[in-house]
Amino acid sequence: MEKTLTIDGKAVKFKTSAALPRLYRETFRRDVFLDLNKARAGIKKKNASADDLPVETLEVIENLAYCMAKYADPSIPDNIYDWLDQFPTTAIYTVAQDILIMWNEEQRTLSVPKK
């Protein structure tokens, strides 16, 4: 799935597929499924704005957004810091919900179980 989202007035492409967990692991040496489970727990506890979320949760959102953007556009810098530098400090969190929705859509079961 590909989608273009606007971050601080800039159009940014994002892409998800079965390859994304591998890209995340290769980029950050971490498991995206474990990271997202922890992030979800932080979001559910707080149920608030980015200002109230734990730093670890915000970092997972940044990492996932970066991987999805890099996957959609390989010309994006290889360093996440260089990519994040083009946005104001909290701008990336404005698309966090869209990014998580894209991730969830990619993960849902496409066939109905027979039993």
Q: At which residue positions do the language-model features occur?
A:
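Charged interaction scaffolds used for protein-protein
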Residues: 1-11, 30-54, 59, 71-115
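Short linear motifs in exposed loops
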Residues: 15-17
